[in-house]
């Protein structure tokens, strides 16, 4: 590794790690919003991934590379169990139900000594690194990009626009909803495992209501037009506190104002603005090329 890169990671390592982890969390929200669902269970799935991986490492002594895939399996199994009853709900009712599930898990973390209780778990081996985190983030973006441009992606878009119409066209709505929930759980669990193994500490308050809303804000700010958009939103909201560090207590106020403005005036997110401009330019160029000089109307 070049010395300058080593110095950069030593100085800004925590921020680089946060960019990757938050990018994965933004994708976990993207996949459920892509099918028109409002689930706020991503923080709960992240907590399951973090706690399961930390316990397997600390209590059982398992190596990180064995724990990493299992930290994805645990939240996926939980999502599979709770998905059947909760996916009967939609809109704000689904959001409330998933928040409730997250609070139940947080209460368990707080009150069970085996998982650290209110003090959390410390001394987790720091086995993850920036290259692994961002490599997995890039892989997730590529996979979701390909999915978005496949038959599955078109079905998801149809569900997001009009679930009833999509179902009438033969889209298996329940299957796609469950698939999106499981993918969301997998991505959030992966983010939890990576976060636990770079910070060496986890606590129950890291996976409550506030983190759930923050994850939602990643996708709202960036947009859900494609997988890159929510990652872009996550990076903006991750870097914003660093840029506003001098404002101290006003950082959260400014952060909230930016989210409100983005939702009101940028319904497709920040990433949608340049994409709309590019699309408009392409349409204008295409129209100009069709209008050949000297062509006479027929």
Where are these regions (language model features)?
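Transmembrane alpha-helices and adjacent helix-loop boundaries
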Residues: 1-298
């Amino acid at each position: 590794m070049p010395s300058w890169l080593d110095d950069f990671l030593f100085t800004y390592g925590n921020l680089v790690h946060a960019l990757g982890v938050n990018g994965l969390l933004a994708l976990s929200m993207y996949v459920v919003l892509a099918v028109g669902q409002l689930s706020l269970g991503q923080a709960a799935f992240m907590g399951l991934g973090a706690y399961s991986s930390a316990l397997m490492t600390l209590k059982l002594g398992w190596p990180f590379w064995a724990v990493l895939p299992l930290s994805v399996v645990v939240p996926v199994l939980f999502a599979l169990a709770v998905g059947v009853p909760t996916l009967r709900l939609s809109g704000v009712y689904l959001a409330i139900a998933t928040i409730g599930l997250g609070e139940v898990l947080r209460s368990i973390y707080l009150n069970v000594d085996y998982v650290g209780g209110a003090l959390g778990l410390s001394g987790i081996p720091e086995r993850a690194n920036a290259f692994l985190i961002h490599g997995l983030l890039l892989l997730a973006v590529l996979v979701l990009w390909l999915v978005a441009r496949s038959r599955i992606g078109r079905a998801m878009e149809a569900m997001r626009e009009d679930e009833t119409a999509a179902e009438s066209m033969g889209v298996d709505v329940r299957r796609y909803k469950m698939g999106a929930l499981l993918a969301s759980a997998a991505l959030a669990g992966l983010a939890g495992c990576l976060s636990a193994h770079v910070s060496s500490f986890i606590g129950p308050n890291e996976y409550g209501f506030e983190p759930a809303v923050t994850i939602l804000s990643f996708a709202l700010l960036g947009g859900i037009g494609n997988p890159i958009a929510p990652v872009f939103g996550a990076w903006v909201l991750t870097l914003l506190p660093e840029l506003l560090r001098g404002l101290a207590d006003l950082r959260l106020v400014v952060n909230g104002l930016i989210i409100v403005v983005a939702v009101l005036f940028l319904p497709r997110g920040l990433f949608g603005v340049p994409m709309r401009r590019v699309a408009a330019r392409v349409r204008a160029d295409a129209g100009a090329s069709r209008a050949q000089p000297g062509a006479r109307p027929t």
